[in-house]
């Protein structure tokens, strides 16, 4: 009995430390994702508008576009990792540090002129997919730590749906379907790049819903570490 009481007291203290004295579950991780996603989409819109200005502008704006995509992927990791590992600081710090380092490496690689050329579109898609798939490790770890919580199962299902949307978008981006089947027919509406962007938006919205599920779950259990220990 005494051991259980000590464990609960330690759990409560850990939760209070994470919450900064019990002022509610932090919202800033969700804001990180929102800012990252909106920044990425704003850069992408600017690149599509101005990249045709000159050859130099094309190179610069598409490099910024690739950096924005990498930043959005990194930002997407922040809320689910933060909320899933709210009471497991070492794991939280390790996973967020790892994806940040991976994002920096990918940006560094894609800012090199050869990798930003059109002929390396498959490599770029592969790098972005690799960044996303690296989330499988923290997802499985979080599932193990929070086994038995229906909200975690729902959030994971939504994240899988998000991954499928992004993967499908990457496939359209690389394959250039359907315009390669009917050249000229989809020049204005319905070409692969438009489908790619629609699927990115679908994935981002799905991810936001998953984050909201995790945040509400943390609120309902008062972010108590004992609820996930």
UniProtKB/Swiss-Prot annotation:
It is found in: Membrane. Residues 1-4, 52-66, 114-124, 175-194 are cytoplasmic. Residues 26-30, 88-92, 146-153, 216-229 are extracellular. One of its GO terms (molecular function) is signaling receptor activity. It is a multi-pass membrane protein. GO terms for biological process: response to hormone; response to sucrose. Keywords: Membrane, Stress response, Transmembrane, Transmembrane helix. One of its GO terms (cellular component) is membrane. The chain crosses the membrane at residues 5-25, 31-51, 67-87, 93-113, 125-145, 154-174, 195-215. Belongs to the ADIPOR family. May play a role in abiotic stress response. This is Heptahelical transmembrane protein ADIPOR2.
């Amino acid at each position: 009995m005494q051991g259980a009481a000590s464990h609960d007291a330690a759990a409560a203290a850990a939760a209070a430390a994470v919450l900064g004295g019990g002022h509610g579950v932090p919202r800033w991780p969700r804001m990180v994702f929102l800012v990252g996603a909106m920044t990425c989409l704003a850069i992408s819109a600017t690149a599509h508008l101005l990249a045709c200005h000159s050859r130099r502008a094309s190179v610069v704006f598409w490099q910024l576009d690739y950096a924005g995509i990498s930043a959005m992927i990194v930002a997407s990791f922040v809320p689910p990792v933060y909320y899933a590992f709210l009471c497991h600081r070492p794991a939280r710090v390790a996973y967020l540090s790892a994806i940040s380092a991976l994002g920096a490496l990918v940006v560094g690689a894609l800012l090199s002129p050869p990798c930003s050329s059109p002929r390396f579109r498959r490599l770029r898609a592969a790098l972005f997919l690799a960044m996303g798939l690296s989330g499988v490790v923290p997802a499985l770890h979080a599932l193990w730590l929070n086994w038995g919580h229906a909200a975690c199962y729902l959030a994971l299902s939504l994240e899988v749906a998000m991954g499928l949307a992004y993967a499908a978008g990457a496939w359209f981006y690389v394959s250039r379907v359907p315009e390669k089947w009917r050249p000229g027919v989809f020049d204005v509406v319905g070409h692969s790049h438009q489908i790619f962007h629609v699927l990115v938006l679908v994935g981002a919205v799905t991810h936001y819903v998953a984050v909201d599920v995790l945040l509400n779950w943390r609120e309902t259990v008062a972010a108590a570490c004992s609820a996930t220990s």
